[in-house]
């Protein structure tokens, strides 16, 4: 059965400006600008109200999978709004049993070098996604802090670091060494 119309709205805060070019959404905020292309999804995007402070996503004559894209697009736009206002921060911790993992940040936080992983001489180099900055925590030992505006780029950079320290040819229940995400949050604290 097809539903005639399914729609959802996203409220836009005062300090955020959204512009639409077809199905491309551009979000401007205090921390910067994010753009995302939704051309591959057959939906209507429109700004409502006199001050254009509400985004509506419409899906006409959709089946179950097509109707699910309405909420997905709203979630993506909400993440973009959160990114340009608060920013996203992931904290990662080094875990090791014997050989201490040595992490060095190069090129202004865009390249992570992992040395002495399981005592290996090989240097693992992980390049951060564009717009993601990495730094070593001053407050906590063996902690990395990744920050940026785009949640997908920040989380993908964290995943690349974690995957660079996978243990090969050993029992992973025993060899738990690696760099893992310990905390997910925002750069600035939300005012409640």
From Swiss-Prot:
Component of the large ribosomal subunit. This is Large ribosomal subunit protein uL6. Belongs to the universal ribosomal protein uL6 family. It comes from Pongo abelii. InterPro entries: Ribosomal_uL6-like, Ribosomal_uL6-like_a/b-dom_sf, Ribosomal_uL6_a/b-dom, Ribosomal_uL6_CS2. The modification N6-acetyllysine is found at residue 121. Disulfide bonds: none annotated. It is found in: Cytoplasm. It comes from the Eukaryota. GO terms for biological process: cytoplasmic translation. GO terms for molecular function: rRNA binding; structural constituent of ribosome. GO terms for cellular component: cytosolic large ribosomal subunit.
